[in-house]
A protein has these predicted regions:
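Rossmann-fold NAD(P)-binding glycine/threonine-rich loop
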Residues: 1-14
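A glycine- and small-aliphatic-rich helix-loop capping segment at beta-alpha/alpha-beta transitions
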Residues: 12-18, 64-65
Length: 342
């Protein structure tokens, strides 16, 4: 799943670089809630805490009134688009009592219940957009945009006079953080940082995503937040995977890496321990040139793989996907707009 937490964790703990991870899931999820309830943009008050791609809207209010789980669930199920595209998020809301900031597809990557079989994937995913659970959707979209960039970007730059006034400021954190630091204007956002005292019922050394304020004095996180028990339990499972993965990557520890993959909720829902061991070996060999810390181990892995003949994995879970569009097809759907998310 997403490496945000692991990268932020490694940069802070191992690299000793003061690093803050930024994601746009909170803003996107808030707009989705506003749209489902017909609330004007940016008029809902909310607070979120958790881990990246599993952050929870702990409090939702509009005009001073609390938005309940029942209200939100009902509005999402009635909405033509969201009822089709957000089935995992709605199911988690109904069962756990809180709405997740993350998209339907990404949330399903952190849980063991929604991608076990092809039937599951078809039931809980949508092909309306890659973000809603399409198998390999991110790879497809990246390939399409890369192909467009290589062929058409130079032509795009030659267009005369791109007027920046035509574009509205996005909800991405970057420009607001710079504005806050340079002008002192306080900015409230949700940031990925080492937990410490921010969320009281998650480990202090892990990376969390929670509410903070940026000003000319820097970033100040709100401390003492306590997640609902059920939400903390889901987060803790992924935190353990992230901790093992970070230490395995930094130390070149193959065995710990395999245990991290084995512990992953989605992997463990479809793979046996033998399959995980074999899969990680094959992945290490395939990506050898980018993994110098594993070099001494990879040589012995190669020898072991040569000894294994006709290893059979369990029948693969077939997902659902769309075909990669070529450049001509992409032009017909305004690829410039899609590529730059304008």
């Amino acid at each position: 799943a997403n490496p945000m937490a692991m990268n932020t964790w490694a940069a802070n703990e191992i690299g000793k670089v003061n690093t803050i991870g930024l994601c746009h899931g909170v803003q996107g999820g808030a707009k989705l809630i506003e749209d489902s309830l017909n609330i004007p943009f940016n008029k809902m008050k909310y607070s979120c805490s958790g881990i990246n791609h599993m952050t929870w809207y702990l409090d939702l209010k509009y005009k001073g009134k609390k938005i309940t789980k029942e209200q939100l669930s009902k509005s999402l199920k009635k909405h033509k688009k969201f009822s089709r595209d957000e089935k995992v998020r709605i199911d988690v809301l109904d069962k756990f009592g809180y709405f997740s900031t993350e998209s339907n597809g990404h949330l399903s990557e952190y849980l063991p219940w929604y991608r076990r079989t092809q039937k599951d994937v078809k039931k809980w995913s949508s092909l309306s957009n890659w973000i809603h659970g399409e198998t390999g959707g991110y790879l497809r979209v990246c390939n399409e945009k890369r192909n467009w960039f290589l062929e058409d970007y130079s032509k795009y730059l030659k267009k005369s006079g791109i007027n920046l006034n035509d574009y509205k400021r996005s909800t991405e954190h970057g420009s607001y953080i710079i504005e806050a630091i340079e002008t002192g204007k306080k900015y409230r956002g949700h940031f990925n940082v080492i937990n410490k005292k921010t969320i009281s019922n998650l480990d202090e050394d892990c990376v969390i995503e929670s509410t903070g304020y940026v000003s000319s004095k820097g970033l100040q996180m709100i401390e003492g937040i306590k997640l609902p028990l059920q939400c903390a339990a889901l987060c803790s499972t992924s935190i353990d995977v992230q901790r093992m993965a970070v230490k395995a990557a930094v130390n070149g520890d193959v065995e710990l890496l395999k245990l991290a993959v084995l512990q992953d909720p989605l992997v463990s829902s479809v793979c046996s321990s033998e399959e995980v061991w074999q899969m990680v070996d094959e992945m290490l060999v395939a990506q050898e040139k980018w993994l110098p810390q594993f070099k001494s181990k990879i040589n012995s892995i190669k020898r072991n793989l040569k000894k294994i003949k006709n290893y059979k994995y369990s029948k693969a879970v077939k997902g659902i996907t769309r075909k990669t569009k070529n450049n001509r097809q992409k032009r017909s759907v305004l690829v410039e707009k899609e590529a730059f998310n304008l």
